[in-house]
C-alpha cells in the first residue's frame, strides 16, 4: 500500500473517531442556561419568579436574575433531591443553580416566601413518590397555593 493510501486511511479513521467521540460526549456538554426573573409584579401577581415552573435536564444551569431589588433565590431544604447541592443566593444578585440530580427543586425568595414567592424546577423524570413527598411539604398558605399550581405541571 502506498504512502498516500495510508494517509487517506488515517484521515478517515481520525474523522470516524472524532464523530464517535462527539456522539458519546456527556449530556453536560449540551447543557442549557435557563433564565428565571425575580419580580415585584408579574403575570401571577405580586412577588413572583417568572417562569415559576421550569423543566430542566441534569447539567442545566438555572439563573435567577433580579428584575427588581430586594429579592434572592434559595433552594428549600425540604424540597431538594437527595445528594443535590443546596443554593442560597445573595440579595439583589443573580443566583445560579446547576442541577446535578434528577427530581424536584423547590425555590424560594426568603424575604417574600410568606407572600408566595416560590418556584419549582423539575429535573428529568420524577417518581410518584417524589411528587407525593413534594406535595406533602408544609408551606405558608400563599406559597402553598403557588407551589400547588407548579406541582400540577410536573409530568
For each feature predicted by the language model, list its residue ranges:
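Residues at the start of alpha-helices and the adjacent loop-to-helix junctions
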Residues: 7-10, 23, 101
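Bacterial N-terminal signal peptides that target proteins for export
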Residues: 3-16
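Extracytoplasmic copper-binding redox domains, predominantly the cupredoxin/blue-copper superfamily
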Residues: 27-155
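Bacterial N-terminal signal peptides
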Residues: 14-25
Amino acid at each position: 500500500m502506498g504512502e498516500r493510501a495510508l494517509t487517506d486511511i488515517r484521515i478517515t479513521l481520525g474523522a470516524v473517531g472524532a464523530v464517535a467521540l462527539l456522539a458519546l460526549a456527556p449530556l453536560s456538554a449540551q447543557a442549557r442556561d435557563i433564565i428565571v426573573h425575580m419580580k415585584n409584579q408579574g403575570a401571577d401577581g405580586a412577588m413572583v419568579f417568572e417562569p415559576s415552573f421550569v423543566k430542566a435536564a441534569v447539567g442545566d444551569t438555572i439563573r435567577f436574575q433580579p428584575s427588581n431589588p430586594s429579592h434572592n433565590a434559595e433552594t428549600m431544604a425540604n424540597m431538594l433531591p437527595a445528594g443535590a447541592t443546596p443554593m442560597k443566593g445573595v440579595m439583589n444578585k443573580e443566583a445560579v443553580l446547576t442541577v446535578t440530580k434528577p427530581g424536584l427543586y423547590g425555590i424560594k425568595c426568603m424575604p417574600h416566601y410568606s407572600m408566595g414567592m416560590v418556584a419549582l424546577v423539575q429535573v428529568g423524570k420524577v417518581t410518584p413518590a417524589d411528587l407525593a413527598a413534594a406535595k406533602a411539604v408544609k408551606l405558608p398558605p400563599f406559597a402553598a397555593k403557588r407551589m400547588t399550581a407548579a406541582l400540577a405541571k410536573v409530568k
